[in-house]
């Protein structure tokens, strides 16, 4: 779809001059150079994003949760009933799920988006971008057509950009869908070139005696559909799912506005791999929240070149890790904007020079 290609070509480059200025500012704060570690690096990364205009700050916050069912559930790769997707999506509208509680704590709004739940009628309270009642069974057919993937990508990109126009400056991504770690593993295996046995995990507490079947399903899906690892849309359409496409769309939409996206867990890593194949320019806008406990997490993150800020043994999904990490983003902005400067008190510390302080 040409409109997507045109939009991806307009993703702004990171402002290296703004990052250099931010580095000098951070080095001149009331502290030894580097003593706030990754918070300093995060503040400098944010300063380089054109959407924040050189000064790290957080306006409105939003977690976009993509909800969809998966045909591959029929292969016995998940123990939860498929109906749980719809039930939990409805619970999200009541604010009672994990991501909703954590997002409320962070002061973020949760946008629950139906991109492919298998119900006869749309669920009240959800944003309706449904493509179909669940994706195809990737063990026997593609997840969707390329046209469906591109249309959903564009819809989510446009929705994300509209939120940015309305003041959202920090995005988080999440998902909801029974059996969705299976297509996620297929994406990770395809793009990283690693064998499914290395990336397939237990998902939502799959018994270990069923893991061999899940690995076999992922291997069959890749062999049958032959996704092109260099083509992110092709990978998503052939072995992905509507929720994974939606997450990729948020990343592309936010990056096109020069704004950061907090990743969540394994599903978001898989979507990020596909999105970065579409546009490597989005990578500096991706901020990893936590290390998922899912087996292939480190493989995916290593391929992305990302190191998460938290390691909480979490694997809930939903965007829970992204919501939890929003306070870290705000902390990085706070030190940048609110700490005093050494030069104002005529303090020179080892590692700081007078020229540094006055620059």
From Swiss-Prot:
Matching Pfam families: DBI_PRT
Active site: 318
Keywords: Cobalamin biosynthesis, Glycosyltransferase, Transferase
Signal sequence region: none
GO molecular function, one term: nicotinate-nucleotide-dimethylbenzimidazole phosphoribosyltransferase activity
GO terms for biological process, alphabetical: cobalamin biosynthetic process
Alphabetized CDD domains for the sequence: DMB-PRT_CobT (cd02439)
EC number(s) per entry: 2.4.2.21
Reactions mediated catalytically: 5,6-dimethylbenzimidazole + nicotinate beta-D-ribonucleotide = alpha-ribazole 5'-phosphate + nicotinate + H(+)
Pathway: Nucleoside biosynthesis; alpha-ribazole biosynthesis; alpha-ribazole from 5,6-dimethylbenzimidazole: step 1/2
Enzyme class: transferase
Source species, domain of life: Bacteria
Record text on subunit structure and interactions: Homodimer.
Function according to Swiss-Prot or TrEMBL: Catalyzes the synthesis of alpha-ribazole-5'-phosphate from nicotinate mononucleotide (NAMN) and 5,6-dimethylbenzimidazole (DMB).
Family: Belongs to the CobT family.
Stated name of the protein: Nicotinate-nucleotide--dimethylbenzimidazole phosphoribosyltransferase
